[in-house]
Amino acid sequence: MEAKDIRELLAQKKMSMRDIVTVGRYTAGHFRNDKKAELYEFSHSDDSYISFNALHVFTFFDAYDLEWLQEKHDDLINCALSETANNKLRLQLTLLLRQPFYPELIRTDFIDFCLSKFTNPALPYAIRALCMKLACKQMTAIPELTDELESNVQLLDQEQLSPSLLSAKRQVETKIENARKKQAAKLKKKTQRS
């Protein structure tokens, strides 16, 4: 299979599961990182079907193959920050949620983006839930940011939430509570040493 064959599969209006598996096999394994790079380039295509389908294929990757995508972490964030199509944004956020976030590499522009999106009632529920979870993933490592996250999550109490958004909110509230316990234990340990 060649890149032009993959392009033809990705150019379909709706890819079948069989085609997704075909492209996945074409790119699977550490010895096919060049093929993953090709697929990633397709995610930047001007053709909306090709770019959407390339991102869609990445969402089916297993944890091993997704490791390769971590080197594209900042690029994925940049793409999400500028994305105007909700369907592509949802896939980009899904891929970012499956990646680790390290406190020393946190991007405040992406935190602000996530906060503004999950509190915006005009956006689709999936995007709001993903942004809430991504904000949590980035902000609970730092006490001051945990406070800000909690304040923003509390803003959601003023609106009627869908079941999916309510579930995401509860999950985030649990993670905030757990983060506070860890932060308190860390502070207690630090004061005992002094």
Language-model features and meaning:
Residues 1-194:
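Alpha-helical scaffold domains
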